[in-house]
A protein has these predicted regions:
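Secondary-structure edge/capping motif, primarily at the C-terminal ends of alpha-helices
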Residues: 128, 182-185
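N-terminal intrinsically disordered/low-complexity leader segments
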Residues: 1-21, 155, 208-225
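All-alpha amphipathic helical-bundle segments outside canonical DNA-binding/catalytic cores
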Residues: 98, 137-138, 156-172, 189
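Helix-loop "lid/cap" segments that line or gate small-molecule binding pockets
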Residues: 87-89, 106-111, 121-130, 153-154
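Helix-turn-helix
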Residues: 2, 25, 29-67, 71
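Hydrophobic alpha-helical segments that form the core
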Residues: 162-181, 193-201
C-alpha cells in the first residue's frame, strides 16, 4: 500500500494536455460537463458556449451530439488508461503482483478525491443501455480493455491461461463492486474493503509466484550465512 497519504490523484495521474484546437476544446469541455452533470443533461449549445467556440466550429468536427459523446468517451478512455498505468507503475514498478495491488491504492486515492463523481464509463453505459449504441460500445471497450490488462498481469505473474481469465473476471467484479459501493453508498473506503478479497484471489491463482517471493528472503539469509 502507499506509504504516504500525501500523494493526490493529480500528482499520480498528471493533468491532461491543454487542448490546442477547437475540436480538442470541444471534447475536453464535453468530458468535464458529461462527467459532472450526465450525458442527457448537457446540450450541444452548453458545450459550445463553455468551450468558447462557434457553432460553425462544432459542426465542422461533429455531425451532432451523438458524435461528440462518442469522441468524449474515447478521449477519456485514452487519457485514463495512460494515467492509471503511469500511476500504478509509480507505486509498483514493473512487478505484476505489486501492480495488481497498487491498482487498489490508486483507486483509494480516487475514491477520496474531492472531485470524485463516479465512473464516466459506468454512467455512459447506464444512460445508453442498448449494447449496440455507439456510446455504450465506447464505454464497454474501456472496461474490456482494463479487464484484459488484469488478465495479462496475471499471466505475467505466472498464471496459466485459463486461470488468468478467471482471475481477471473475479478481480474485475470486485473492482466494479467497489465502484458501486463508493458511488451509491458513499463508502470512501470501498477500495480497502475489497482488498482482502483481491489478496485472496492472488493467493489462489498465483500461489507459485507468492511462494517464490516468500522464500526469497530465506535464500538470501542462507547465502549470507
Amino acid at each position: 500500500m502507499l506509504k504516504s497519504r500525501t500523494k493526490s490523484v493529480s500528482e499520480l495521474f498528471g493533468l491532461p494536455d491543454p487542448p490546442a484546437t477547437g475540436r480538442e476544446r470541444l471534447v475536453a469541455t464535453a468530458i468535464e460537463l458529461f462527467y459532472r452533470r450526465g450525458f442527457g443533461a448537457v446540450g450541444v449549445d452548453q458545450v459550445i458556449a463553455a468551450a468558447g467556440v462557434t457553432k460553425t466550429t462544432f459542426y465542422k468536427h461533429f455531425e451532432g451530439k451523438d458524435d461528440l459523446m462518442v469522441a468524449a468517451v474515447q478521449r477519456r478512455d485514452e487519457w485514463e488508461s495512460h494515467a492509471w498505468g503511469r500511476a500504478v507503475r509509480k507505486i509498483a514498478g514493473d512487478d505484476p503482483i505489486k501492480q495488481l495491488l497498487a491498482m487498489l491504492d490508486v483507486m483509494d486515492l480516487w475514491f477520496n478525491d474531492a472531485d470524485f463523481q463516479g465512473c464516466m464509463f459506468v454512467s455512459a453505459a447506464a444512460e445508453f443501455p442498448n449494447p449496440h449504441d455507439p456510446v455504450h460500445q465506447a464505454a464497454a471497450a474501456y472496461k474490456q480493455r482494463t479487464r484484459d490488462h488484469r488478465r495479462d498481469l496475471a499471466r505475467a505473474a505466472g498464471a496459466e491461461s485459463a486461470a488468468a481469465e478467471t482471475f481477471a473476471d473475479c478481480y474485475t467484479a470486485l473492482i466494479e463492486g467497489a465502484l458501486v459501493l463508493r458511488q451509491m453508498n458513499g463508502r470512501n473506503d470501498a477500495a480497502r474493503v475489497v482488498r482482502p478479497a483481491v489478496e485472496q484471489l492472488i493467493a489462489t491463482y498465483l500461489p507459485q509466484r507468492l511462494q517464490e517471493k516468500q522464500q526469497a528472503p530465506n535464500r538470501r539469509l542462507k547465502t549470507i550465512g
